[in-house]
């Protein structure tokens, strides 16, 4: 279990003062100018050594991502864009940072922008996050008044401006290039790659898009050192991380823990255990709605990190899990997710535009048991045709929960079809 002195987000639950004065008391904005004066290369090398991987779901090494930005300007400005469009069902970790500990994000944005040669950064915040936007804007205004942003930001000699942009509630804008399109005032639709954002991103200029948590942990890593951060977790899965627990746990929460914590320990220590005890566990979606669902047996010894989730044929994602007990109709739960992805498809790619709707309709029939057993395999085959055949990962996100359901809960689907045929279809369980 993570010790309190090792926590980065010390006001995660809003028990303290979120203002600039409160943030300084908790150690933020301490020696920021000295960190910047180390130079771009040393900061990026330190981030690489820390082993920090993107906290938005993809898990790409953060230091390496920063190193893709041009070392010398060709006349175009560079930009940092922070993805605060946290829209995936069950994922609610970044909003706690913005609502209660916004200065971790603002200080991180200054340091990260300097490391990439960017004099401006944009925070693209989800349309529904009204209170979070107010808290973040108030914190930004405080920093401008205190000289921590603007000309000679924090006395570092680096000029830096930070802008907050409110989205309009589209899940697809969480994809980095769709986010850039939306930020430019266009319809949020993913771009073809290459060119990658580091070559031609916002307004055709070099751009890096990072998740809120990825940026917010930067100042603490650089203060305490890469070795400190890398000491948590295991190789390739280093550091501390925000985990979310929702669903049928006794105490749903967002909690900061070390990477590579066993799933069962996370649920029992921080989630207060499964409602009705561990034996009442039926399934877990481990990292947000797009991850393949796991059975109770798989969860018993599963490790919550990138490699651990890959070992059980799922995904670490955002590490915000949905816990389902025996009262859950898991087939209907996955249908609900397929409905979400169908609704949020931008329609640009045919496999996603047509496939998400088709998968949702077949799932709806499977929920009712109004299908043939052979259709289960056909549905699985179609998910494989959608997966990997779209510009962005929304097609994959729609396919994976269904694939996990068929792999791990096929008997439940078949039983429902047989029960419908024999007239034994009972009352449906809770979702």
Curated annotation (Swiss-Prot):
Can you tell me which residues bind FMN?
167-214
- Which cofactors does the annotated protein need, by name? FMN; [4Fe-4S] cluster
- A Gene Ontology CC term for this entry? plasma membrane
Q: Which reaction does it catalyse?
A: a quinone + NADH + 5 H(+)(in) = a quinol + NAD(+) + 4 H(+)(out)
Look at the named UniProt entry and state the broad enzyme category this protein falls under.
Answer: translocase
Q: Could you tell me the membrane topology recorded for this protein? A: Peripheral membrane protein
Q: Spell out the subcellular localization from the entry.
A: Cell inner membrane
Which residues of the sequence carry a binding annotation for [4Fe-4S] cluster? 346, 349, 352, 392
Q: Which Pfam families match?
A: Complex1_51K (PF01512), NADH_4Fe-4S (PF10589), SLBB_2 (PF22461)
Q: Name one GO molecular function term.
A: 4 iron, 4 sulfur cluster binding
Q: How does it assemble?
A: NDH-1 is composed of at least 14 different subunits, Nqo1 to Nqo14. The complex has a L-shaped structure, with the hydrophobic arm (subunits Nqo7, Nqo8, Nqo10 to Nqo14) embedded in the inner membrane and the hydrophilic peripheral arm (subunits Nqo1 to Nqo6, Nqo9) protruding into the bacterial cytoplasm. The hydrophilic domain contains all the redox centers.
Q: What is the recorded name of this protein?
A: NADH-quinone oxidoreductase chain 1
């Amino acid at each position: 279990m993570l010790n309190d002195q090792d926590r980065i987000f010390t006001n995660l639950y809003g028990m303290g003062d979120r203002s600039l004065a409160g943030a300084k008391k908790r150690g933020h904005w301490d020696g920021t100018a000295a960190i910047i004066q180390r130079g771009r290369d040393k900061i990026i090398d330190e981030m690489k050594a820390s082993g920090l991987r993107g906290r938005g779901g993809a898990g790409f090494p953060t230091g390496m991502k920063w190193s893709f930005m041009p070392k010398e300007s060709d006349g175009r400005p560079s930009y940092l864009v922070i993805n605060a469009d946290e829209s995936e069902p069950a994922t609610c970790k970044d909003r706690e940072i913005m609502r209660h500990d916004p200065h971790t994000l603002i200080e991180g944005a200054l340091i990260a922008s300097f490391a990439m040669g960017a004099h401006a950064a944009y925070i693209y915040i989800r349309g529904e996050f009204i209170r979070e936007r107010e808290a973040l804007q108030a914190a930004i205004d405080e920093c401008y008044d205190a000289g921590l942003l603007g000309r000679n930001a924090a006395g570092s000699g680096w000029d830096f401006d930070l802008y907050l942009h409110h989205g309009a509630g589209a899940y697809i804008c969480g994809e980095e290039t769709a986010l850039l399109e939306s930020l430019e005032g266009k319809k949020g639709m993913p771009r073809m790659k290459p060119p990658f954002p580091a070559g031609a991103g916002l307004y055709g200029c070099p751009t890096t898009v990072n998740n809120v948590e990825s940026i917010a942990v930067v100042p603490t890593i650089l203060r305490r050192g890469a070795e400190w951060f890398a000491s948590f977790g295991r190789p390739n899965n280093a550091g501390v991380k925000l985990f979310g627990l929702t669903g049928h746990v006794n105490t749903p929460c967002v909690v900061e823990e070390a990477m590579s914590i066993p799933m069962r320990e996370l649920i029992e220590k921080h989630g207060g255990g499964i409602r009705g005890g561990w034996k009442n566990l039926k399934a877990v979606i481990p990292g947000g709605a797009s991850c393949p669902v796991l059975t109770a047996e798989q969860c018993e010894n599963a490790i919550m990190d990138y490699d651990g989730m890959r070992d059980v044929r799922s995904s670490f994602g955002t590490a915000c899990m949905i816990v389902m007990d025996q009262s859950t109709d898991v087939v209907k739960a996955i249908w609900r997710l397929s409905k979400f992805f169908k609704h949020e498809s931008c329609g640009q790619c045919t496999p996603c535009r047509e496939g998400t709707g088709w998968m949702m309709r077949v799932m709806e029939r499977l929920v009712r048991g109004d299908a043939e057993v052979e259709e289960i395999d056909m549905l699985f085959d179609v998910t494989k045709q959608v997966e990997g055949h779209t510009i962005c990962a929304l097609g994959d996100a729609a396919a994976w929960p269904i694939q996990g359901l068929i792999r791990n809960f096929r008997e439940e689907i078949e039983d429902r079809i047989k029960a419908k045929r024999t007239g034994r279809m009972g009352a449906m369980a809770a979702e």
